[in-house]
Amino acid sequence: MPELPEVETSRRGIEPHLVGATILHAHIRNGRLRWPVSDKIYRLSDTPVLSVQRRAKYLLLELPDGWIIIHLGMSGSLRILSEALPAEKHDHVDLVMSNGKILRYTDPRRFGAWLWTKELEGHNVLAHLGPEPLSDEFNGEYLQQKCAKKKTAIKPWLMDNKLVVGVGNIYASESLFAAGIHPDRLASSLSTEECDLLARVIKAVLLRSIEQGGTTLKDFLQSDGKPGYFAQELQVYGRKGEPCRVCGTPIVATKHAQRATFYCRHCQK
């Protein structure tokens, strides 16, 4: 599933081609996504795009009378086309722009979403979200406060959007490795120093992935059709049985709530 770096990479890639241009019309080939494509999106016509923002794993297209909320789901990606290339099987939505560009949404598993809302505040998919991990609000002090009485493993807690948004399976595993923290540790067992370190490395890992265009394991592509290159720098995720790049110990894979977790039993305590 695309996580924060992939969604932010998509935002940065599409923003220059959408802001200041006008949506001439939307072409919906298959509106049966995780939730049906909102009726308002079908009827878009001569609508300028004012901004392209991100909240958690949601892309937000600001229009004069409301917002398009896009979620990439498990396998979605957005591309900017310079011409109307023939659509393939999993190309479900096109926004045809006044500058000759086309924003094309591809989603093999159709777990994504294209929603419309008049107001962002209070929308059900955006309500109850925790802070952005790259914000000043997310720091060691905040993390320690939230972990202090939490009797659950730190790995799934990091993936809870009520704690912090956008840190999914890949970046939770990678951040815990970078901090030297075992994913099975109780959140409440983390010291002040460990919380400070973990908050810092989460930011560093996410920023590095954004620099590299995110992580492509299967479906995700950047808006120019290129893969995300952070996959080449993964330390533990997807490397079961391979030697740890630090100590040489084989990487272990376990499952937490049906999600694979990767770690080094020597480097992470």
UniProtKB/Swiss-Prot annotation:
<dbReference type="Pfam" id="PF06827">
    <property type="entry name" value="zf-FPG_IleRS"/>
</dbReference>
<keyword id="KW-0326">Glycosidase</keyword>
<comment type="similarity">
    <text>Belongs to the FPG family.</text>
</comment>
<dbReference type="InterPro" id="IPR015887">
    <property type="entry name" value="DNA_glyclase_Znf_dom_DNA_BS"/>
</dbReference>
<feature type="binding site">
    <location>
        <position position="150"/>
    </location>
    <ligand>
        <name>DNA</name>
    </ligand>
</feature>
<dbReference type="GO" id="GO:0034039">
    <property type="term" value="F:8-oxo-7,8-dihydroguanine DNA N-glycosylase activity"/>
</dbReference>
<feature type="active site" description="Proton donor">
    <location>
        <position position="3"/>
    </location>
</feature>
<keyword id="KW-0234">DNA repair</keyword>
<feature type="binding site">
    <location>
        <position position="90"/>
    </location>
    <ligand>
        <name>DNA</name>
    </ligand>
</feature>
<dbReference type="Pfam" id="PF06831">
    <property type="entry name" value="H2TH"/>
</dbReference>
<dbReference type="InterPro" id="IPR010663">
    <property type="entry name" value="Znf_FPG/IleRS"/>
</dbReference>
<dbReference type="InterPro" id="IPR015886">
    <property type="entry name" value="DNA_glyclase/AP_lyase_DNA-bd"/>
</dbReference>
<feature type="active site" description="Schiff-base intermediate with DNA">
    <location>
        <position position="2"/>
    </location>
</feature>
<keyword id="KW-0238">DNA-binding</keyword>
<feature type="zinc finger region" description="FPG-type">
    <location>
        <begin position="235"/>
        <end position="269"/>
    </location>
</feature>
<keyword id="KW-0863">Zinc-finger</keyword>
<keyword id="KW-0456">Lyase</keyword>
<keyword id="KW-0511">Multifunctional enzyme</keyword>
<comment type="function">
    <text>Involved in base excision repair of DNA damaged by oxidation or by mutagenic agents. Acts as a DNA glycosylase that recognizes and removes damaged bases. Has a preference for oxidized purines, such as 7,8-dihydro-8-oxoguanine (8-oxoG). Has AP (apurinic/apyrimidinic) lyase activity and introduces nicks in the DNA strand. Cleaves the DNA backbone by beta-delta elimination to generate a single-strand break at the site of the removed base with both 3'- and 5'-phosphates.</text>
</comment>
<dbReference type="InterPro" id="IPR012319">
    <property type="entry name" value="FPG_cat"/>
</dbReference>
<dbReference type="Pfam" id="PF01149">
    <property type="entry name" value="Fapy_DNA_glyco"/>
</dbReference>
<keyword id="KW-0479">Metal-binding</keyword>
<dbReference type="InterPro" id="IPR020629">
    <property type="entry name" value="Formamido-pyr_DNA_Glyclase"/>
</dbReference>
<dbReference type="GO" id="GO:0006284">
    <property type="term" value="P:base-excision repair"/>
</dbReference>
<feature type="active site" description="Proton donor; for delta-elimination activity">
    <location>
        <position position="259"/>
    </location>
</feature>
<dbReference type="InterPro" id="IPR000214">
    <property type="entry name" value="Znf_DNA_glyclase/AP_lyase"/>
</dbReference>
<dbReference type="GO" id="GO:0003684">
    <property type="term" value="F:damaged DNA binding"/>
</dbReference>
<dbReference type="InterPro" id="IPR035937">
    <property type="entry name" value="MutM-like_N-ter"/>
</dbReference>
<protein>
    <recommendedName>
        <fullName>Formamidopyrimidine-DNA glycosylase</fullName>
        <ecNumber>3.2.2.23</ecNumber>
        <ecNumber>4.2.99.18</ecNumber>
    </recommendedName>
</protein>
<keyword id="KW-0378">Hydrolase</keyword>
<comment type="subunit">
    <text>Monomer.</text>
</comment>
<feature type="active site" description="Proton donor; for beta-elimination activity">
    <location>
        <position position="57"/>
    </location>
</feature>
<feature type="binding site">
    <location>
        <position position="109"/>
    </location>
    <ligand>
        <name>DNA</name>
    </ligand>
</feature>
<dbReference type="GO" id="GO:0140078">
    <property type="term" value="F:class I DNA-(apurinic or apyrimidinic site) endonuclease activity"/>
</dbReference>
<keyword id="KW-0227">DNA damage</keyword>
<dbReference type="GO" id="GO:0008270">
    <property type="term" value="F:zinc ion binding"/>
</dbReference>
<keyword id="KW-0862">Zinc</keyword>
<dbReference type="InterPro" id="IPR010979">
    <property type="entry name" value="Ribosomal_uS13-like_H2TH"/>
</dbReference>
